[in-house]
């Protein structure tokens, strides 16, 4: 009960702080695509005050899309559309200061430390329609996303299952770079 109350208070503080911080920040840029082959695309994600981390996409299966998101805008959107008192083991966002309490946070940290030779899979982001518009739904990679947000990266790419949601997410939290289909991305390889 106290943890839920603490998270509710931290959530309110984060929403106030992120609302005030957005206009003052310089625009985020897309993460650098550092490797592109038939088997993998790898992006370098700068992490403040520590080594960069790397995210990857692999071709195959159903068509997916890469959307480069502004981390602060995405965090605010996800947090404000999550309940004030999130349920445990849900897709709800928690305040940054509570993200490291996720049971898999240490595993995500270890995976990101593996560097460019063993990049981490892009988080998979979905949505559902709500009375207030669209709400964020994490289908895979929630703890990875927590790690990136807790470490205050400026932007990072995510994977999205369909073109319409890629366009919507890009409008809600994108950095101004059009979403790209995996098929188009992997057709660019040399």
Task: Cite the ranges covered by each PLM segment.
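Short alpha-helix boundary/capping and kink motifs at helix termini
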Residues: 2-30, 34-35, 39, 46-62, ...
């Amino acid at each position: 009960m106290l943890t839920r109350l603490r998270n509710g208070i931290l959530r309110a503080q984060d929403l106030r702080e992120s609302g005030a911080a957005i206009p003052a920040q310089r625009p985020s840029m897309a993460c650098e695509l550092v490797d592109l082959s038939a088997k993998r695309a790898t992006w370098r994600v700068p992490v403040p005050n520590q080594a960069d981390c790397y995210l990857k996409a692999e071709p195959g299966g159903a068509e997916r899309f890469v959307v480069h998101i502004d981390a602060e805008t995405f965090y605010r959107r996800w947090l404000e559309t999550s309940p004030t008192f999130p349920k445990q083991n849900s897709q709800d966002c928690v305040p940054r200061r509570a993200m490291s309490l996720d049971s898999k946070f240490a595993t995500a940290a270890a995976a990101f430390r593996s560097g460019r030779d063993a990049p981490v899979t892009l988080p998979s982001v979905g949505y559902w329609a709500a009375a207030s518009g669209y709400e964020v739904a994490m289908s895979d990679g929630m703890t990875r996303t927590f790690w990136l947000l807790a470490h205050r990266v400026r932007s990072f790419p995510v994977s999205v299952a369909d073109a319409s949601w890629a366009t919507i997410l890009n409008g809600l939290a994108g950095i101004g770079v059009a979403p790209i289909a995996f098929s188009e991305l992997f057709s660019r390889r040399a």
